[in-house]
């Protein structure tokens, strides 16, 4: 690809995203599809655009993204994390702004495992006194 591109890896839940940024006109490609084609939900699209809107670079950069694993929400979060890391590699002075917005920190929350004797991770079977 281009010689002046910047890379960031993002993770969220069980999703992992690889984000490549290069100067351009605001084109976002996710797994060979446009942002609108890939994410049907508007909330997921908003999550992906958040770091770019914060630093006002929506129209200045082209993004090429590959993402695997998880669902829509996890993938959107992973892409946001990856974009943030790539932006920091692109311009270190953006770190403070992105940190303040909470985009730099990896969201470490994972699904809690189901326990034996319970219906879900914490949901117990109904208790009958008599």
Swiss-Prot record:
<keyword id="KW-0687">Ribonucleoprotein</keyword>
<protein>
    <recommendedName>
        <fullName>Small ribosomal subunit protein uS9</fullName>
    </recommendedName>
</protein>
<dbReference type="Pfam" id="PF00380">
    <property type="entry name" value="Ribosomal_S9"/>
</dbReference>
<dbReference type="GO" id="GO:0003723">
    <property type="term" value="F:RNA binding"/>
</dbReference>
<dbReference type="InterPro" id="IPR014721">
    <property type="entry name" value="Ribsml_uS5_D2-typ_fold_subgr"/>
</dbReference>
<dbReference type="GO" id="GO:0003735">
    <property type="term" value="F:structural constituent of ribosome"/>
</dbReference>
<dbReference type="GO" id="GO:0006412">
    <property type="term" value="P:translation"/>
</dbReference>
<dbReference type="InterPro" id="IPR023035">
    <property type="entry name" value="Ribosomal_uS9_bac/plastid"/>
</dbReference>
<dbReference type="InterPro" id="IPR000754">
    <property type="entry name" value="Ribosomal_uS9"/>
</dbReference>
<dbReference type="InterPro" id="IPR020574">
    <property type="entry name" value="Ribosomal_uS9_CS"/>
</dbReference>
<keyword id="KW-0689">Ribosomal protein</keyword>
<comment type="similarity">
    <text>Belongs to the universal ribosomal protein uS9 family.</text>
</comment>
<dbReference type="InterPro" id="IPR020568">
    <property type="entry name" value="Ribosomal_Su5_D2-typ_SF"/>
</dbReference>
<dbReference type="GO" id="GO:0022627">
    <property type="term" value="C:cytosolic small ribosomal subunit"/>
</dbReference>
């Amino acid at each position: 690809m281009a010689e002046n591109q910047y890379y960031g890896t993002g993770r969220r839940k069980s999703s992992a995203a690889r984000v490549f940024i290069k100067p351009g006109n605001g084109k976002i490609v996710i797994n060979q599809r446009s942002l609108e084609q890939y994410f049907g939900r508007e909330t997921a699209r908003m999550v992906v655009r958040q770091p770019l809107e914060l630093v006002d670079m929506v129209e200045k950069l082209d993004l090429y993204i590959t993402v695997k694993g998880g669902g829509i929400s996890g993938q959107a979060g992973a892409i946001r994390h990856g974009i943030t890391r790539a932006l920091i590699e692109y311009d270190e002075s953006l770190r403070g702004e992105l940190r303040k917005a909470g985009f730099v920190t990896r969201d470490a929350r994972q699904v809690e495992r189901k326990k034996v004797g319970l219906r879900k991770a914490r949901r117990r079977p109904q208790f009958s006194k008599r």
